[in-house]
A protein has these predicted regions:
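Conserved core of the PLP fold type I
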Residues: 65-148
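N-terminal "arm"/small-domain region of PLP-dependent enzymes with the aminotransferase-like
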Residues: 2-66
């Protein structure tokens, strides 16, 4: 017996299409005969990680077999101190996709509309559909966002 598990997903998830990433640098170099290419798409840093981040990662290698503090106590308090706010005003996530999905799940009901600019982050319509809400993309006005 076979089962089409995609039919079990909510209607919003059924409307999602797989992400199509940009071309790898190597493919672009081959296609266009280029040697030096700086990739600015896909939210990647062409400069690489900072030396301080690499050093912090090296110092932590002997602890990678442990789960980190899921509440991010130290990070939340350091950010709160730096920003001059209470730590309970800080929400941490695994990147902006994760935080935007948390917000969408908390506030969007099936059938709600989520309004965003045509140039908004690509995750907005995806998390909206995933919550069975309706994504509404609006045109930009004079190179800005007018969501009124």
């Amino acid at each position: 017996m076979t089962c089409d598990y995609t039919q079990l997903a909510n209607n919003g998830v059924q409307q999602l299409r797989p992400y199509q990433p940009g071309k790898p640098v190597e493919e672009l170099q081959r296609e266009l005969g280029l040697r030096d290419v700086v990739k600015l798409a896909s939210n990647e840093n062409p400069l690489g990680p900072s030396h301080r981040a690499l050093e912090a990662a090296r110092r932590s290698l002997d602890q990678i077999h442990f789960y980190p503090d899921g509440a991010g106590f130290e990070l939340k308090h350091a950010l709160a101190d730096n920003l001059g706010v209470s730590s309970d005003r800080i929400t941490l996530g695994n990147g902006s996709n994760d935080v935007l999905e948390l917000v969408a799940r908390a506030y969007l009901q099936p059938g709600d509309e989520a309004v965003f600019s045509e140039y908004a982050f690509a995750i907005y319509p995806l998390v909206t559909l995933g919550c069975s809400a309706k994504p509404v993309s609006v045109d930009s006005h004079l190179y800005g966002h007018d969501l009124a």
